[in-house]
């Protein structure tokens, strides 16, 4: 079998030195043209396939940076490796180490290569341009796409120092028209009014109860924020002023209603770790221990605590199809999964009944659940597996083409029934391919 190697060659460097288009094996030329040195934004590379005597094939790729964000060595190697893969696979037939989800044909979820190994926390797209989106995560990760999530480029926030940004874990991004908001830890909030071209930092009061946990863009200058203490605020002037929507924190509510008999309420540690907002502005949240859950409906002065319906603690909870009128889903320790009937009373302190189903996860915990539509439901299961239901959550089966992705999958998010993403650890991003379902 003929030995084949791949060479990475900077095309601009070749042109600057008067070289011909033939690539030199295993050599990378880093010099750039005068125009490129002036702009500092683009480098065009040619990836060649050579057996040491002649070039068999080549392709080209452009490595580009924007907003003053320099291309890191890792990002550069990522681009070049993808180009090499494009050259090598059709010609050599060689086995290439690549993510399983990307190499299996016909998979409903395929892995999108990313220039990062950070944990991915959130993703959102602009309603004005559905192909334009942002992805955030740990170690200051900020990525932008303009092709619907097929490719992603690193970005940076102007109001956050480069060294400082690496210490942040950006946990939430939300778009509404050109309005965009991002929050993270240590407590930070950023806002854009032009679809993400420019960002400004919103100052947070040191008296803010808790840390920002969720922000939702609602329109021009308008957004809602929930903190880890359960405080809910709304701004209508771009974050200059915030109006409280609840009269007290969750801790104060539980102290006042301790006689309500909510199991586990006395063990509340003072903060919630997960909160979701539906399309009508209703919220649902769970505390760190998962021993009860809480709901809030617009116009209420307080959160309403609810006892869990089983002895096992709640792992995750949310609204069915992001709509409280359609019911609530919950996952419990050990792979339990349950759904309520539609139109449950979120203001009642009576125990809400969940109909439990057999998720067939073998005891592995379910980390998130998302509805593609009213029939097709997906679940992210511990160990990097995806499970699916085609009957509204009644019966489940494992998706074998994604079960060995090699990283935990934490969040599933759909943007309509035909586009969805799964976010995980180690920079794992899966994109939904409805044509394979």
UniProtKB/Swiss-Prot annotation:
Coiled coil: none annotated. It is found in: Plastid, Chloroplast thylakoid membrane. It is a peripheral membrane protein. The keyword Thylakoid applies. GO terms for cellular component: chloroplast thylakoid membrane; photosystem II. The keyword Plastid applies. Keywords: Chloroplast, Membrane, Photosynthesis, Photosystem II, Plastid, Thylakoid, Transit peptide. Disulfide bonds: none annotated. One of its GO terms (biological process) is photosynthesis. InterPro entries: PSII_CF48-like_dom, WD40/YVTN_repeat-like_dom_sf. Belongs to the Ycf48 family. A 7-bladed beta-propeller torus, about 54 by 55 Angstroms, with a depth of about 25 Angstroms and a central pore. NCBIfam families: PRK13684.1. Essential for photosystem II (PSII) biogenesis; required for assembly of an early intermediate in PSII assembly that includes D2 (psbD) and cytochrome b559. This is Photosystem II stability/assembly factor HCF136, chloroplastic.
């Amino acid at each position: 079998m003929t030995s084949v190697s791949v060479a990475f060659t900077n095309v601009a460097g070749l042109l600057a030195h008067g070289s011909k288009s033939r690539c030199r094996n295993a050599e990378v030329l880093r010099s750039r043209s005068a125009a490129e040195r002036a702009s500092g934004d683009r480098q065009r590379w040619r990836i060649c396939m050579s057996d040491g005597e002649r070039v068999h094939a080549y392709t080209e790729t452009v490595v580009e940076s924007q907003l003053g964000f320099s291309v890191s060595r890792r990002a550069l190697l990522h681009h070049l490796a993808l180009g090499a893969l494009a050259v090598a696979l059709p010609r050599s037939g060689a086995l290439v180490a690549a993510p399983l989800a990307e190499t299996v044909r016909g998979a409903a979820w395929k892995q999108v290569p990313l220039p990062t190994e950070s944990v991915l926390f959130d993703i959102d797209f602009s309603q004005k341009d559905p192909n334009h989106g942002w992805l955030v995560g740990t170690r200051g990760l900020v990525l932008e796409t303009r092709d619907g999530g097929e490719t992603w480029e690193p970005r940076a926030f102007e109001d956050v120092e480069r060294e400082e940004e690496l210490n942040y874990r950006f946990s939430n991004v939300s778009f509404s028209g050109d309005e965009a908001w991002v929050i993270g830890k240590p407590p930070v909030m950023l806002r854009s009014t032009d679809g993400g071209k420019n960002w400004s930092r919103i100052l947070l009061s040191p008296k803010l109860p808790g840390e920002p946990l969720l922000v939702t863009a609602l329109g021009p200058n308008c957004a809602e924020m929930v903190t880890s203490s359960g405080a809910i605020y709304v701004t209508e002037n771009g974050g200059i002023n915030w109006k409280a929507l609840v009269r007290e924190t969750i801790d104060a509510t539980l102290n006042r209603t301790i006689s309500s008999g909510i199991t586990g309420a006395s063990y509340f540690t003072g903060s919630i770790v997960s909160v979701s907002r539906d399309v009508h502005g209703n919220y649902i949240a769970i505390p760190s221990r998962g021993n009860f859950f809480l709901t809030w409906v617009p116009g209420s002065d307080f959160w309403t605590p609810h006892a869990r319906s089983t002895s096992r603690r709640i792992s995750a909870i949310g609204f069915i199809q992001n709509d409280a009128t359609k019911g609530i889903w919950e996952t419990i320790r050990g792979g339990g999964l349950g759904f309520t009937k539609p139109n449950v009373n979120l203001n009642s302190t009576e125990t809400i009944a969940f109909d439990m189903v057999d998720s067939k996860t073998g005891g592995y915990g379910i980390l998130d659940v998302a509805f593609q539509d009213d029939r097709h439901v997906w679940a992210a299961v511990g160990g990097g597996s995806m499970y699916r239901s085609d009957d509204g959550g009644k019966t489940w089966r494992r998706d074998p083409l994604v079960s060995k992705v090699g990283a935990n999958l934490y969040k599933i998010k759909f943007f309509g029934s035909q586009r969805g993403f799964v976010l995980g650890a180690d920079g794992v991003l899966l994109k939904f391919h409805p044509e394979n379902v």
